């Protein structure tokens, strides 16, 4: 109910812009490798399905992103339809990022610990979603997900939920890691 006005206004703006469907749907991986269809507001032109699938290379200034899409990404509004995934039980509010299926195998080869992300249900928000941005490397996002999993507590989830709201008001909320340190817990190294 709280986000209804934002959801409705965004859907209307996307429909009036006429750049294709309102929603972007894609298969993603979650707990135990289960697959679900994530729902997001469309931020890219719908002209070429292959280009749409290549969202990893989408960066600031990418010509595939619509003008409305730039605004939605800047303030992370494109992520709000994932609340539907949460209500369906496919995602949790807080957890590791829901990864594209084609990237799970690739990232597991590059970062073997990546497979541990599937120990928890994917989340709408989490450490990687807050500290990592659209242009943060997959390896760094995986490390942030692992830090979250290793330090999971309900109080930590609550803290991350509160921090999520602050990204809507930060200008750098989508710019990736900079020179600043991550406000992250330390990873416990086990022998």
Mark where each language-model region is.
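A hydrophobic, helix-centered structural microdomain
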Residues: 1-47, 85, 154, 159-191
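Short, hydrophobic secondary-structure boundary micro-motifs
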Residues: 10, 24-25, 53, 94-96, ...
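Gly/Ser/Thr-rich helix-start
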Residues: 19-21, 34, 70, 90, ...
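Short, glycine-rich, amphipathic interfacial segments at transmembrane boundaries or analogous
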Residues: 24-64, 124-143
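A short, structured surface patch at a secondary-structure boundary
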Residues: 58-121, 160-168
């Amino acid at each position: 109910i709280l986000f209804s006005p934002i959801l409705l206004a965004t859907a209307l703006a996307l429909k009036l812009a006429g750049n294709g469907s309102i929603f972007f749907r894609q298969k993603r991986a979650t707990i135990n490798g289960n697959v679900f269809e994530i729902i997001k507001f469309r931020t890219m032109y719908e002209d070429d399905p292959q280009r749409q699938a290549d969202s990893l290379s989408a960066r600031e200034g990418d010509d595939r992103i619509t003008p409305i899409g730039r605004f939605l990404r800047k303030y992370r509004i494109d992520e709000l339809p994932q609340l539907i995934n949460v209500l369906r039980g496919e995602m949790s509010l807080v957890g590791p990022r829901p990864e594209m299926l084609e990237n799970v195998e690739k990232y597991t080869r590059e970062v073997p610990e990546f497979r541990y992300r599937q120990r928890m249900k994917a989340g709408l928000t989490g450490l990687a979603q807050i500290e990592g941005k659209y242009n943060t490397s997959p390896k760094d996002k995986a490390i942030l997900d692992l830090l979250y999993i290793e330090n999971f507590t309900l109080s930590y989830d609550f803290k991350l939920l509160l921090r999520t709201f602050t990204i809507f008001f930060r200008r750098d909320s989508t710019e990736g890691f900079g020179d600043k340190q991550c406000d992250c817990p330390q990873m416990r190294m086990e022998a």
